[in-house]
């Protein structure tokens, strides 16, 4: 499931989740943050490619402020499942993921932010050459097992 779908299902109580793992999540088509500008090109994930993907996903629908598309515009996230948010320091999506984690916390949702210093978007797929990636995977597993145990 992608982040907007989980947001909609969980906040409408259509789905009961012990937790969610958001790994360098994309939270909307209009990325306008410091990290999206600083890491827009040359850091694996290109902002122009991300916008193209959203255009394909949304078609002609242009209401990017709809929380079903961009959960950062949600009026209320009360009842959303606990979240583990994995961010890479050198990722254009970093700042919006951190902002979403803050929004979840504002509505009383338990959030763990795991930031990989010096890493790029997609670093978890490189665990065979980046030992720190496996440390993040272990941290995610630990937090997720706690969420499930407390569900």
Label each PLM-derived region with a short phrase:
Residues 1-151:
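Alpha/beta-hydrolase superfamily serine-hydrolase fold, recognizing
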């Amino acid at each position: 499931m992608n982040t907007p779908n989980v947001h909609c299902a969980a906040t409408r109580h259509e789905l009961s989740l012990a937790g969610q793992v958001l790994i360098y999540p994309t939270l909307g088509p209009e990325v306008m943050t410091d990290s999206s500008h600083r890491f827009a090109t040359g850091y694996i994930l290109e902002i122009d490619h991300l916008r193209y993907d959203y255009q394909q996903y949304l078609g002609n629908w242009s209401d990017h402020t709809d929380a079903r598309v961009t959960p950062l515009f949600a009026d209320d996230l009360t009842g959303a499942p606990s979240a583990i948010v994995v961010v890479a320091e050198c990722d254009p999506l970093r700042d919006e993921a951190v902002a979403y984690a803050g929004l979840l916390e504002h509505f009383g949702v338990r959030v763990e932010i795991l930031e990989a210093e010096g890493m790029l978007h997609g670093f978890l797929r490189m665990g065979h050459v980046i030992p720190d990636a496996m440390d993040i995977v272990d941290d995610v597993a630990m937090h997720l097992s706690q969420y499930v145990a407390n569900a």
